[in-house]
């Protein structure tokens, strides 16, 4: 089943925070759309773009700016050879089967079309389209793609499941499992868990998985971030209830902050530098001592585009995770990409180390 998102209105296209909110909400309803189209209400091809998108997809969500809504309603009605009727204070296609404030749903030839009028800085109207995809997401760690496919594809064939792995970072894949008509996704997952114990995250959201398992185990975590600049803290605090497990974090960008706030020794910085395993180990211990948490994560590196040297080029990053019992893992990474992508990869590498040092609560399948 194909899905599509159409965003109408130039004002929406460049508001990245609002677009991220729209995408996150839609993913909860129809997963990740197979196609996303951006178009302005004044585009001369608007009619044909909508006609083509609706023809190609089965589930279509059309998000319009406030001043594009009425025009889109006319176009959608024309495409369905319908008139417009006043419903809930909206002039919308007459065959709309469900309608609420700023949202309505049409069913045409087994297709579902949900049109929404959105406003920046406001809560999105309700999505009326219902999730129908049989796809589920899970993650696999500590396997490379060839090995992952060799192990999972025979199982997938046995249970009539189509799998699509996506590489998050080295050794961490997000896998979409799509159930065919006669497939058995529950038995597929049981077999996967039996085949790969302590390598499977059976949850669609990796960060929510970490937060929920910390809460179940009544464990706390603290962060000492340098090159990631608070990104890991941001990832964790997107989840409601994280205050029960997240003690806090320090963005220790300058060496003087690493020394005075985290207790990193001057001789460590002078001898090894801030971008070093030795520094990250002391950052881990320093933030754990300050917060009295059960786990700590630390990052230090060169995200670029400047700051690299021959010995430590751009993309050189050290990440670490530790437990209060003294279990510590630190890794040196050589990453590629722009500044933001290097930071994101660093964050996930650090979180993967957390899964390992806390394997008794995260990977106890």
Predicted features by range, described:
Residues 2-131, 141-156, 182-365:
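Short alpha-helical segments enriched in small residues
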Residues 164-168:
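Short beta-strand
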Residues 170-181:
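A generic structural motif
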Residues 134-135:
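Phosphate-/polyanion-interacting regions in eukaryotic proteins
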């Amino acid at each position: 089943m194909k899905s599509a998102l159409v965003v109408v209105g130039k004002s929406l296209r460049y508001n990245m925070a609002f677009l991220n909110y729209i995408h996150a909400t839609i993913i909860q309803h129809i997963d990740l759309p197979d196609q996303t189209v951006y178009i302005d209400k004044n585009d001369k091809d608007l009619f044909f773009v909508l006609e083509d998108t609706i023809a190609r997809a089965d589930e279509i969500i059309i998000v319009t700016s406030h001043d594009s809504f009425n025009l889109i309603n006319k176009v959608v009605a024309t495409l369905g050879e319908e008139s417009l009727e006043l419903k809930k204070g909206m002039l919308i296609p007459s065959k709309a089967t469900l309608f609420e404030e700023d949202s309505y749903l049409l069913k045409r030839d087994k297709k579902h079309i949900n049109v929404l009028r959105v406003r920046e800085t406001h809560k999105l109207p309700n999505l009326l389209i219902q999730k129908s995809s049989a796809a589920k997401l899970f993650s696999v760690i500590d396997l490379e793609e060839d090995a992952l496919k060799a192990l999972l594809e025979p199982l997938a064939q046995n249970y009539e499941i189509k799998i699509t792995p996506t590489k998050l970072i080295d050794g961490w894949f997000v896998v979409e499992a799509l159930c065919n008509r006669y497939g058995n996704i529950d038995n597929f997952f049981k077999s996967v868990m039996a085949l790969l114990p302590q390598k499977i995250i059976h949850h669609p959201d990796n960060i929510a998985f970490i937060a929920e398992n910390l809460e179940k185990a009544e464990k706390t975590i603290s962060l000492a971030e340098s090159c990631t600049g608070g990104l890991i803290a941001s990832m964790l605090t997107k989840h409601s209830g994280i205050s029960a497990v997240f003690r806090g974090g320090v963005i220790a960008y300058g060496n003087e902050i690493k020394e005075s706030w985290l207790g990193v020794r001057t001789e460590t910085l002078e001898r090894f530098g801030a971008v070093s395993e030795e520094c990250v180990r002391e950052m881990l211990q320093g933030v754990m001592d300050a917060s009295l948490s059960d786990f700590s994560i630390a990052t230090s590196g060169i995200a670029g585009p400047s700051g690299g040297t021959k010995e430590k080029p751009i993309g050189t990053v050290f990440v670490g995770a530790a437990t209060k019992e003294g279990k510590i893992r630190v890794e040196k990474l050589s990453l590629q990409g722009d500044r933001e992508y290097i930071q994101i990869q660093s964050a996930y590498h650090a979180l993967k180390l957390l899964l390992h040092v806390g394997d008794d609560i995260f990977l106890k399948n």
